[in-house]
């Protein structure tokens, strides 16, 4: 039986390579209350995670070749600015101090509140920008939860010549793909105005978005 999957080509080109599937762990965010004497340590833990997230993004920005399209750096800079934005960072700190929530849960509550605001926007393009919030918050949460880096984020990753398959990609993921000489990528979600599509065109990497179930029906190292 032949199975056909359909998506939207958003960047020109043809590529053949073995598949590498990004399987992001579903982050299990704990919810608990801390003791009054733990508040300072918990706020410090969140601030340290934010600082490390900035450090990671600056390192990724440093991988952008000088000859690359100027459209790329602003995507990383946007995420860096969000990490400095009081709207994202100060409310979780307040929740830690006032309600004595753990850092992960306080951050999740603020993420949900901000996403609700974006969901109510009439402009379809602006609604999709809630993905920026998810990408930034997920980076902080992975640090707080001490999650292992994904393979394509590891400095010694050997992915040259691979085709990356993922549910979605953050701008930082897309930049690292070029750094590791990944030849193409496929995402299950996204459209022609998504970050993934815009960056693929800027980086001149063949790409297909919106190919639902691509990860489910592809095995690691399949020739694609």
Residue ranges: model-predicted function:
Residues 1-224:
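Non-catalytic, soluble scaffold/interaction modules
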């Amino acid at each position: 039986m032949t199975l056909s999957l359909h998506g939207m080509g958003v960047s020109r080109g043809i590529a053949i390579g073995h598949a590498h599937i990004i399987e992001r762990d579903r982050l299990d965010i704990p919810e608990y209350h801390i003791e009054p004497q733990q508040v300072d340590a918990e706020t410090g833990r969140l601030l340290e995670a934010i600082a490390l997230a900035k450090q990671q993004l600056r390192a990724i920005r440093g991988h952008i070749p000088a000859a690359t399209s100027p459209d790329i750096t602003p995507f990383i800079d946007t995420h860096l600015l969000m990490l400095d934005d009081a709207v994202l960072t100060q409310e979780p700190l307040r929740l830690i101090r006032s309600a004595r929530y753990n850092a992960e849960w306080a951050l999740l509550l603020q993420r949900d509140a901000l996403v609700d605001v974006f969901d109510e926007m009439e402009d379809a393009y602006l609604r999709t920008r809630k993905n920026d919030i998810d990408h930034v918050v997920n980076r902080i949460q992975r640090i707080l939860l001490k999650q292992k880096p994904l393979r394509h984020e590891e400095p010694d990753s050997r992915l040259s010549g691979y085709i990356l398959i993922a549910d979605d990609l953050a701008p930082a993921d897309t930049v690292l793909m070029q750094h590791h000489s990944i030849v193409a990528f496929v995402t299950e979600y996204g459209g022609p105005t998504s970050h993934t599509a815009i960056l693929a065109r800027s980086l001149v990497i063949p790409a297909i978005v919106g190919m639902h179930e691509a990860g489910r029906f592809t095995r690691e190292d399949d020739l694609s």
